[in-house]
């Protein structure tokens, strides 16, 4: 289905608590304009805007076009998640550290996340930053791991965004998000591999017992 701007008259953008989006719809029109309109409507309605660029470089006309378009809506987001590969691509810096990550910070951002694969994730807010280790599993397919991570995060904060202001609570949320990402890699496919709440909690319980 091709998303067109008039389709944004649908109520979902004005009723959403969270509006999560990527960058692929920015590649061509009419999707680009529809994307921008939907983002604006969700923001005006008070939704939490979550952005995962989800870089697919071969789909773009050029690396420069990808960077330009991805960054064109950067300062709209409340939460941004990038992978270490995306961080390197966007900053042109092969050094994955706090300074490089914070070069992507914008004044209205509430949470910046950098996922590091088997090394876990780093988190940044205006008041604190740190890292959370992930769980070692026998991975068979990493497809969907990032989506699982973000989905678990948003699921836990959608009704209580104060989590973003309290580091210990945020770390607990990210631990569960890391668990969901890890579980997803143990199965083939993206959607079929996404864990339920019960599966994630059972996984965490087993980790404690080991």
UniProtKB/Swiss-Prot annotation:
GO biological process, one term: fructose metabolic process
Transmembrane segments: none
PROSITE patterns assigned to the protein according to its UniProt record, in alphabetical order: PFKB_KINASES_2
Enzyme class: transferase
Assigned keywords, A-Z: ATP-binding, Carbohydrate metabolism, Kinase, Nucleotide-binding, Transferase
Family, as annotated: Belongs to the carbohydrate kinase PfkB family.
PANTHER family membership: FRUCTOKINASE-2-RELATED, HEXOKINASE FAMILY MEMBER
Protein name: Putative fructokinase-8
